[in-house]
């Protein structure tokens, strides 16, 4: 079932839900996190082999010495409301969004 909504000006709009962030493209800038009111994604550390180590909270992370870089990771996809704010601010276009009827449970 596809959900369509009508905006105030009468045009239709269909939510596109965040399902993934490309770890090879993401630069970990955090812009998407800042505009997301639902805390769908968080900053994670990644090592040189590409393994995601865990969430970075800015405190004393156990793996701080192992970090090669940081990336955004979808931690709570079910919280996404499909507004697309994260996609609009992403400088690398590294996110995948899909309509509700395309999401496999």
Swiss-Prot record:
Between which residues do disulfide bridges form? none
Q: What is this protein called?
A: Putative ferredoxin-3
SUPFAM superfamilies noted in UniProt: alpha-helical ferredoxin
Alphabetical UniProt keywords = 4Fe-4S, Electron transport, Iron, Iron-sulfur, Metal-binding, Nitrogen fixation, Plasmid, Repeat, Transport
Enumerate the spans annotated as 4Fe-4S ferredoxin-type domain.
17-46, 70-100
**What residues bind [4Fe-4S] cluster 1, as annotated?**
26, 29, 32, 36
Keyword Iron among UniProt keywords: yes
Concerning Gene3D superfamilies, the annotation shows: 3.30.70.20
Q: Which residues bind [4Fe-4S] cluster 2?
A: 80, 83, 86, 90
Which GO biological process annotations does it have?
nitrogen fixation
The cofactor remark states:
Binds 2 [4Fe-4S] clusters.
Listed Pfam families? Fer4_7
GO MF annotation, one: metal ion binding
Instruction: Provide the function of this protein.
Output: Ferredoxins are iron-sulfur proteins that transfer electrons in a wide variety of metabolic reactions.
Q: What cofactor does this protein call for?
A: [4Fe-4S] cluster
Q: Which InterPro entries match?
A: 4Fe4S_Fe-S-bd, 4Fe4S_Fe_S_CS, FdIII_4_nif, Fe-S_Ferredoxin
